[in-house]
């Protein structure tokens, strides 16, 4: 058994703990709406990027080790998965589930479908938007992805077509939902939005 610190990263600080630490909000077990939005955004970013994603067990319910960054020899209370948090943060669990279903249903997000480079959309400020694949020069891809790191709602132009949500920043599903959008879309604060063309 290799007990060196290089053997594994599972004892490092969890995403939730990192968010709490950076925000200097000490009660690691307490839910926090702002940090839950950041947690959803982080998951939305890495699950819409090319390559194979890696997430730590329990991330989908904001697993915490109460700020302890090295629990290698720590007690079971810190190293176990606290399933009561999964019940308390069911909406976050469902969000992760939806993102994973989207990634499974749309292989162009992973880059594993052999698609061309994503088409980056021209957007103002800190907004990022892209179409994961191209279908010729004049046709948009079937998906559009937007990242809004701002703490306020932002407007972004849409590629041509009629678009519906797969992810609106708080809900994610492999089947489109919500009303159709054309020309522009209002992005929720601190969110990832995924749209599918009709």
Model-identified regions with their sequence ranges:
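Single conserved hydrophobic/aromatic residue that forms the stacking wall/gate
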Residues: 1-11
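Active-site-proximal loop/helix segment associated with metal-binding centers of metalloenzymes
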Residues: 13, 17-19
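Carbohydrate-interacting/catalytic domains
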Residues: 14, 31-198
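Metal- or metallocofactor-binding catalytic centers and their adjacent structured scaffolds
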Residues: 22-32
């Amino acid at each position: 058994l290799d007990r060196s610190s290089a053997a594994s990263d599972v004892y490092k600080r969890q995403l939730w703990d990192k968010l709490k630490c950076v925000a200097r909000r000490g009660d690691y077990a307490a839910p926090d709406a702002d940090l839950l939005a950041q947690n959803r955004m982080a998951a939305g970013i890495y699950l819409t990027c090319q390559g194979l994603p890696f997430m730590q067990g329990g991330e989908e319910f904001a697993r915490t080790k109460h700020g302890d960054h090295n629990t290698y020899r720590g007690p079971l209370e810190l190293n176990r998965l606290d399933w009561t948090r999964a019940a308390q943060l069911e909406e976050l669990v469902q969000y992760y589930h939806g993102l994973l279903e989207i990634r499974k249903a749309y292989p162009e997000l992973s880059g594993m479908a052999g698609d061309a480079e994503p088409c980056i959309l021209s957007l103002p400020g800190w907004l990022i938007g892209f179409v994961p694949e191209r279908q010729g020069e004049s046709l948009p891809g079937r998906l559009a992805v937007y990242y809004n790191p701002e703490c306020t709602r932002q407007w972004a132009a849409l590629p041509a077509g009629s678009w519906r949500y797969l992810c609106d920043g708080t809900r994610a599903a492999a089947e489109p939902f919500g009303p159709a959008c054309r020309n522009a879309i209002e992005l929720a604060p601190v969110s990832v939005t995924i749209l599918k063309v009709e």
